[in-house]
Amino acid sequence: MDSGGKLKFYRILTSVILGAFIIYSNLYWVQPLITLFSKSFNQSPASASLVLSITTIALALGLLFAPFLSNNLGRKNTMVYSLLLTSLFNMMSMVIDHFYWLLLMRFLIGICISGFLASVITYLIEEVKKEWLGRVVGIYVAGTALGGVLARTISSLLVEHYELSTVAVIIGGATLIASNLFWIMLPQSSNFIKRTYALIHLKNGFMASLLDNKIRGIYIAHFFTIGIYTSVLNYISYPLTKPPYSFNQSVIGLFYFATLSGVVGSLLFGRLIGKFFDISLYRISLLIMAVGAVLTTSHILWFVITGLIIFAFGIFASNTMASNWIANNAPSTHKTEANSLYSIFYYLGSSIIGWLSGYLFLFFGWSIFIFLLSGLLVLTAFLLRGKKHELELEDHSYQKNENST
């Protein structure tokens, strides 16, 4: 790689880390404050969790059309507009003290985020050499972990000194400045070719990706995986505010530093993919998550912290594996749609399971809630299987028919 190529590579690398930080800061700063939103707006835990779930629902809906926008505006322009609008809407999210106004702004934030997510992996596929792609995607996913954990921690610390509305303005303002830096640093696409694109092409791309045995199983599995991750982080603040812990909000925010282990998980699995690109890595990451989740049911504080560390390591390792699997196995003419469909399943799982699981938590309590989620992770790992470079959910009826012939 010559000096010009190195400079471009590092500009891309720095920019996507910054973009990940911006997106996931605006997305997740509300998560550790769900208990406060519940009190401020007189909402149940499940209803208060809509401040996150409504955003991820909108994100999933936006991803249905974001590839069309990405193709027409170009990768960089789509990402820049997405980041700027996301930050502005976040600053406006609590200018009116009403729960439904907040939900409206969070919905619009989700729509804007979809533009970035529909473009970033495709941009990397187009602009980064294949031998470096796995590592760069791993670093990008690590950036998402960093953005999420810093946003959760900073918002928890800020809310001890400022109103929720002020916290929204501070985070939105900081990411607005960062969005302009992203605009300046990210190189223009040099390998992007604008296609003649109609909505029928979008539909065909989604269907081709959904029917592809190599990637369909990942879509389904990650729907549940990210939903479980969101559920644990949505509601863990409730048991931490009660005996034997009785922590205040700023202390609870520090627990989210444990999820920085996701950076290690992303980087480690990003390297492993280059040497051992097999779906068994994904199954291992799900089992790691299950072990970590179970540890959070302990009344021993260090077990809870260790559990969160292991749990976050597992989810970000699985994200890296899944993102690379889609990038390498998606239909060659439908890369953008395949990545968008992955994100749709990802965020639908986050919103639907993250919201509905709140009722399980209310009904069963923390320990049984966690054992149910961990059991689902183990079941998913068991049902997934790899056959050469194919990936599919285990179909017992199909196997039975095969054995009888």
Residue ranges of each PLM-predicted region?
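Juxtamembrane intracellular "pre-TM" segments in multi-pass secondary transporters
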Residues: D2-K6, P187-Y219
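Paired small-residue
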Residues: L85, F89, Y100-L108, W302-I310
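Cytoplasmic helix-loop-helix junction between adjacent transmembrane helices
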Residues: M105-G143
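A late C-terminal transmembrane helix in Major Facilitator Superfamily
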Residues: N329-W366
